[in-house]
Design a protein with these regions (language model features):
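ACP-dependent fatty acid/polyketide chain-elongation machinery
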Residues: 1-66, 244-256, 352-366, 410-415
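Condensing-enzyme catalytic core mediating Claisen C-C bond formation in acyl metabolism
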Residues: 4-8, 31-35, 214-290, 298-299, ...
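Conserved beta-ketoacyl condensing-enzyme motif
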Residues: 7, 20-23, 28-163, 191-200, ...
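A glycine- and small-aliphatic-rich helix-loop capping segment at beta-alpha/alpha-beta transitions
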Residues: 21-26, 112-127, 177-180, 200-213, ...
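Phosphate/pyrophosphate-binding loops at sites that engage ATP/ADP/AMP, CoA/4′-phosphopantetheine
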Residues: 84-97, 246-253, 283-299, 321-326
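Glycine-/small-residue-rich "gating" segment that lines the acyl/pantetheine channel
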Residues: 124-131, 169-172, 176, 192-248, ...
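Acyl-CoA/ACP chain-elongation machinery
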Residues: 182-227, 260-274, 304-311, 328-379
């Protein structure tokens, strides 16, 4: 028997705040989380701005001894998982069978800070000075591994790595595992901490990042003057739980996950297919599985990276999948205009935005939107949040390698 799947816990560390509620409140207020890069000296760099996490001290949160052995990416993930577990009520002994609790938390690049630091150590001091913790701190599965250890989660584990679609796929695969009975609940999401010289230089070299130095206008998804994305960092972890299990224990339910689409463009390593066939098919798969009725109060949290190619291609894909009439009635926005592009964490934090939007009837805006682009002709909720009677939500994400993910959600109404 297939299970329905609920979202019962949310945790976030983001450029907008170090909790899920702070992040959501900032989204609704149209707050920009982008500012001058402080993690390193940008004098030699064309890129000057990023969406950094602010006020998070790993030494204070974990203690200096433990923090020293955790890459910042993993620190963000573990903090978000703590909040999600507490929010779901799973931090209480006996609340869930730990052999039925899984962890699907990924990262686009993993512990890149650790890798680069140790490369410099080899160059400066020789190979014998490399940390014995380097490998365990660097590999992308360690967010999932450390979360499982921390919360004694002994169920299925699946660290996902699909670039910018990572945590969307993690949420989708967790949904599938619970739907088909492999777990009662799964911590699903992603984390990233790659605002470092090497990553910024690499993304700049492939012409993905904006060189606009003004934080207030640097990230402007769907605007005609957009010219690249802004690097972000942080983590978001959701507790997905079978509806039966959640209702039996009286859990708070934010929304129901009802569909998932996973496709690949098979087109190019970094550029999206201009025909948008892959993302359109992912949306269609999610909508079909969830029996979504797009004309009945739909919010779409678009990938909306603020790059020329993505935003026009994604717009075409949304229209191709849902049809012109349904899309014209839908509310669309890109919360990346506020969070920046959190890479491996972006899918989960955008599913969070969908769940909160459904529960509270508020559509977060696309800020910095001023000049319409004829190729991007939907209602992108410009600059201010709006109230709306929502029944359905879609979160779409695309990653380097042609990876596409779409997650469909439904507003939860206790029957």
């Amino acid at each position: 028997m297939e299970q329905r799947v609920a979202i019962t816990g949310i945790g976030a560390v983001s450029p907008l705040g170090n909790t899920a509620l702070a992040t959501w409140a900032a989204m609704c207020a149209g707050t920009c989380g982008i500012g001058p890069i402080t993690h390193f000296d940008t004098d030699a760099f064309a890129v000057k701005v990023a969406a950094e996490v602010k006020g998070f001290d790993g030494n204070e949160y974990f203690g200096k001894r433990d923090a020293k052995h955790l890459d910042p990416c993993v620190q963000f993930a573990m903090a978000a998982s703590d909040e999600a577990m507490h929010d779901a009520g799973f931090d209480v002994e006996g609340a869930i069978d730990r052999e039925r609790l899984g962890v699907y938390v990924g990262s686009g690049v993993g512990g890149m800070t650790t890798l680069v630091d140790n490369v410099h150590t080899i160059a400066d001091r020789g190979p014998r000075r490399v940390s014995p913790y380097m490998i365990a701190m660097m590999i992308p599965n360690m967010a999932s591994g450390n979360i499982a250890i921390r919360h004694k989660a002994k169920g299925p584990t699946l660290p996902v790595v699909t670039a910018c679609a990572t945590s969307a796929h993690a949420v989708g695969e967790a949904f599938r595992a619970i739907k088909h009975g492999y777990a009662d609940a799964i911590l699903a999401g992603g984390a990233e901490a790659a605002i470092i010289p090497d990553a910024v230089a690499g993304f700049t070299s492939c012409r993905a990042l904006t060189t606009n130095p003004d934080p207030a206008t640097a990230c402007r998804p769907f605007d005609a003057d957009r010219d690249g994305f802004v690097m972000g960092e942080g983590a978001c972890v959701l507790v997905l739980e079978s509806m039966e299990h959640a209702q039996a224990r009286g859990a708070h339910i934010y929304a129901e996950v009802v569909g998932y689409g996973n496709t690949d463009d098979a087109y190019h390593i970094t550029s999206p297919d201009p025909e948008a066939a892959g993302i359109a098919r992912a949306i269609s798969l999610a909508v079909t599985e969830g029996d979504v009725k797009p004309s009945e109060g739909l919010y779409i949290n678009a990938h909306g990276t603020s790059t020329k190619l993505n935003d026009s291609s994604e717009t075409a894909g949304i229209k191709r999948a849902l049809g012109e009439d349904a899309v014209r009635a839908a509310h669309v926005s890109s919360t990346k205009s506020m969070t920046g592009h959190m890479i491996g964490a972006t899918g989960a934090i955008e599913v969070m935005a969908c769940a909160m939007a459904l529960e509270q009837g508020v559509v977060p805006p696309t800020i910095n939107y001023h000049t319409p682009d004829p190729a991007c002709d939907l209602d992108y909720t410009p600059n201010r949040a709006v109230r709306a009677d929502l029944t359905w939500a879609l979160s779409t994400n695309l990653g380097f390698g042609g990876h596409n993910a779409a997650i469909a959600l439904r507003r939860y109404t206790r029957s």
